[in-house]
Design a protein with these regions (language model features):
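Juxtamembrane or sensor-core-proximal signal-transducing alpha helices
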Residues: 537-574
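Transmembrane alpha-helical segments that form the functional core of multipass membrane systems
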Residues: 434, 438, 444-548
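Non-transmembrane functional regions of envelope-associated proteins
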Residues: 2-292, 296, 300-302, 387-479
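Single conserved hydrophobic/aromatic residue that forms the stacking wall/gate
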Residues: 578-589
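Short, contiguous acidic/charged loop-to-helix segments that flank catalytic cores in large enzymes
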Residues: 413-419, 548-552, 581
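Intrinsically disordered, low-complexity acidic Ser/Thr-rich regulatory segments
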Residues: 150-172, 362-386, 521-526
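Long, low-complexity, polar/charged, intrinsically disordered or flexibly structured peripheral segments
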Residues: 316-378
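Membrane-interface segments at or immediately adjacent to transmembrane helices
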Residues: 52, 56-65, 557, 567-577
Length: 590
């Protein structure tokens, strides 16, 4: 027993420096991770899992049909290039003629929730001009402008007729459409924004929609973004608070849509379990990212409407069902700019209505055949509507509006592609509805150096484990072989880290021969994230530190032997003496 203890003491006496180097490497790398030195690289590795390892969950590029068969609860209605070309009005579109029409058509088509990602926080300009014209036009002004009028009675008649000749205020019409939709059971959610102005008192306030919309009592949701340090959108806030009202939660747009769709009562309030990093909202559990009020969005795919511009003529990615605003307003009373595309498309989804051009088909059999091809029945059952019992997110994707975000799919398929801001809400909503949250070891990956996130002990253990694996390899084999084995260890760890995201730790092996293995998407809630960069850096620091130490000590040994025996022994014999003790880690010559 004593001899064993002596051997252990002797071992550590001769090898304490490599162990010390390893401990220092663990501490140093952990400190660097804590202050955020690896955050940018770690975030890029996070994105790599989405755009390369897993790919989309929905759309035609999905590796299997698990999520496609299930379908999504979110439908997009976009001001896209098609709407820009076909809508018979210039931007900004009239609130009464376009947006009110869209709301009415969607609620009639069965939409359960209508979410606007377009702000209406200032009065409609064209309606204000008409309003000002009515208010400032006097009988004297009319008499002066129309010399043929001689009688003030005629001028008064014209003055009284002006309000009937000029279109109604667009804000009034939009507010009425919101109220009408909600009366028929469709929840309308309007965006609000938390604004900070240092010169105002208090410095923070909420920019609400205009009075007419507020009078319709819509749901309101914040649209303030939460960006990572590299400007990408990966997280989504549940709520925000103002400094002077820290106990009042203002829910975000996506959470309000989730609340309306799941019928969560107004009395429910998010509560945080700091031990398990879980937000409880109603009967639902939301996995928080760190100690903050946000969660990681499990993006379902790249931008739905993006098409690769090359000779392959591939279809759009189609992550979510997407429809142009032009077709949502396209009924008999709206004429699109291009008559060839004016098919009254939306009429087929409205109860009891059949497009006029179909009714104009004289041959009964042809008319029935066309109705069957279009999915139209005599009663026009809304169960065939793509909007029935769906959350419809309305926003803009046209390039001139610059409402785009960088997401984990920014480099999908090797092509840089921005995601419309409205789709960040859609992905967040679908993540909550499916409970498809991302599990992160320790609760977070980045930004530990702030008051909200605690540095997880599990990360230190992971860094320590890989560093000591590198140490043990170096203790038993020479640096060249050790370097190869450590490289293999790093590749295995990288493959496992990526594989955990798709629920398959053998992803690394399968990726070398994808045609031989069936590719499957992870089940709901089965995506796991572990830190990749800090553990790999710790391995590199450990290896370099120990090899550098060995090199320095070897040079000192050579110098000592040369100075001591150089006059008596040949140089070749001196070099061979350095490696006499053992072939892998020589005892130091004292």
């Amino acid at each position: 027993m004593i001899s064993m203890i002596d051997r252990i003491k002797k071992y550590f006496k001769n090898n304490w420096v490599p162990w010390l180097i390893t401990v220092v490497a663990v501490i140093t790398v952990s400190l660097f991770q804590w202050v955020g030195a690896f955050d940018t690289l770690e975030l890029k590795m996070y994105d790599y899992r989405f755009n390369t390892v897993r790919g989309p969950l929905t759309g035609w590029m999905a590796s299997d049909s698990t999520y496609i068969k299930k379908g999504t609860d979110v439908v997009l209605v976009e001001v896209d290039d098609e709407a820009w070309r076909l809508v018979p009005e210039e931007w900004p579109y009239p609130r009464g003629g376009i947006w009110a029409k869209a709301i009415r058509n969607l609620y009639k088509a069965g939409a359960k929730v209508i979410v606007f990602d377009i702000q209406f926080d200032s009065p409609e300009n064209r309606s204000e001009i008409y309003k000002d014209l009515i208010q400032t036009t006097t009988t004297d002004y009319i008499l002066n402008q129309v010399p043929s009028l001689r009688d003030s009675t005629q001028a008064e008649y014209i003055q009284n007729s002006l309000p009937k000749l000029i279109p109604r205020h667009g804000d009034d019409m939009l507010g009425e459409a919101v109220a009408e939709a909600q009366m028929f059971g469709t929840t309308v959610i309007m965006p609000a924004k938390m604004v900070t102005e240092p010169t105002s008192v208090p410095p923070q306030y909420i920019a609400y929609p205009v009075r007419q919309i507020m009078n319709a009592n819509p749901e309101l949701g914040l649209i303030n973004d939460q960006m990572d340090l590299d400007g990408f959108s990966r997280r989504y806030s549940l709520f925000d608070v103002m400094a002077h009202e820290p106990d009042k939660y203002y829910l975000t747009l996506g959470v309000k849509a989730f609340k309306a769709f799941e019928d969560i009562p107004d009395t429910a309030k998010p509560y945080f379990d700091s031990e398990n990093l879980i937000w409880s909202y109603g009967n639902h559990k939301i996995k928080a990212y760190g100690q903050g009020n946000s969660f990681l969005v499990n993006y379902y795919g790249p931008p739905s409407g993006y098409k690769v511009r090359d000779e392959r003529n591939l279809p759009a990615w189609s992550t979510f069902p997407k429809y142009s605003l032009a077709y949502i307003i396209d009924t008999e009373d709206v004429t699109l700019r291009d008559p060839m595309e004016d098919l009254d498309w939306m009429t087929q989804f409205l109860p009891g209505e059949i497009p006029e051009w179909i009714m104009a088909i004289e041959d009964d059999s042809e008319r029935v055949e066309m109705m069957e091809a279009m999915g139209i029945t005599e009663g026009n059952d809304i169960s065939n509507s793509p909007f029935n019992n769906k959350i419809v997110v309305i926003g803009t994707s046209v390039e001139v509006h610059h409402d785009y975000k960088q997401t984990p799919y920014y480099n999908f398929s090797g092509i840089q592609q921005l995601t419309p801001g409205m789709e960040t809400h859609a992905n967040a909503i679908q993540t909550m509805l499916d409970k498809n949250y991302i599990n992160v070891l320790g609760g977070g990956l980045t930004e530990f150096f702030n008051e909200f996130n605690k540095y997880p002990f599990s990360h230190i253990l992971l860094i320590t484990l890989l560093s000591f694996v590198a140490l043990l390899i170096l203790l038993f084999v020479n640096p060249i072989i050790a370097g190869f084995l450590i490289l293999v260890t790093c590749l295995v760890y990288f493959a496992i880290g990526c594989g955990l995201f798709i629920g398959d730790i053998f992803w690394g092996i399968k990726s070398f021969a994808p045609s031989l293995f069936e590719s499957k998407l992870p089940e709901i809630g089965e995506s796991y994230i572990i830190p990749i960069v800090p553990p790999l850096v710790s391995v590199g620091v450990t290896y370099i530190g120990i090899v550098l130490y060995d090199f320095i000590m070897e040079q000192q040994d050579k110098k000592y032997l040369k100075n001591t025996f150089g006059a008596y022994i040949s140089p070749d014999l001196i070099l061979s003496l350095i490696h006499i003790s053992e072939p892998t880690r020589p005892e130091r010559i004292s």
